[in-house]
Amino acid sequence: MEDQIRQLKDIFDRFDMDADGSLTILELAALLRSLGLKPSGDQIHVLLASMDSNGNGFVEFDELVGTILPDLNEEVLINSEQLLEIFKSFDRDGNGFISAAELAGAMAKMGQPLTYKELTEMIKEADTNGDGVISFGEFASIMAKSAVDYFGLKINS
């Protein structure tokens, strides 16, 4: 936890251009862009408002920690375990990969049957090394990308 706080402080200080101990909306936008995110102006305003617990229009370091670290501390560990469980539920034969047939079966079981076109598009998008199956790493990447898209932020390609 201390390492995470130290890393977060380094990042915060790097983007606190005037070294006043707080991030302006422009400094927050620069920090987000450095992480590969492309939030719109409205999204940055909403994010700043949600982080700005003292209502002064800036994000202080403790507000950043209060927003980010609870998630890093508990949620990330829980989510990686949950992600592995989801992956295993798709990987019916337990070989460490999700085949097209396993993906189709799992989606149908969840009440979301796929057309052949949808299935091939999903495999193509997730299968970054082109071996025809989805590894856990590829599965985790596509799930992370989906989460980023869900929150309305875009990753630089």
Swiss-Prot record:
Which keywords annotate this record?
A: Calcium, Metal-binding, Repeat
- Entry binding sites for Ca(2+) 3: D91, D93, N95, E102
**Which SMART domains does the annotation name?**
EFh
Q: Does the keyword Cell cycle apply?
A: no
Q: Which Gene Ontology terms cover its molecular function?
A: calcium ion binding
Residues that bind Ca(2+) 2, according to the entry?
Answer: D52, N54, N56, E63
- Please state every residue range assigned to the domain named EF-hand: 3-38, 39-74, 78-113, 114-149
Name the InterPro entries on file. Answer: CALM/Myosin/TropC-like, EF-hand-dom_pair, EF_Hand_1_Ca_BS, EF_hand_dom
> Is Calcium given among the entry's keywords?
yes
Task: Identify the residues that bind Ca(2+) 4.
Answer: D127, N129, D131, E138
Q: Outline what the protein does.
A: Potential calcium sensor.
Positions with a binding annotation for Ca(2+) 1: D16, D18, D20, S22, E27
Query: Which protein is depicted?
Result: Probable calcium-binding protein CML15
Disulfide bonds listed in the record: none
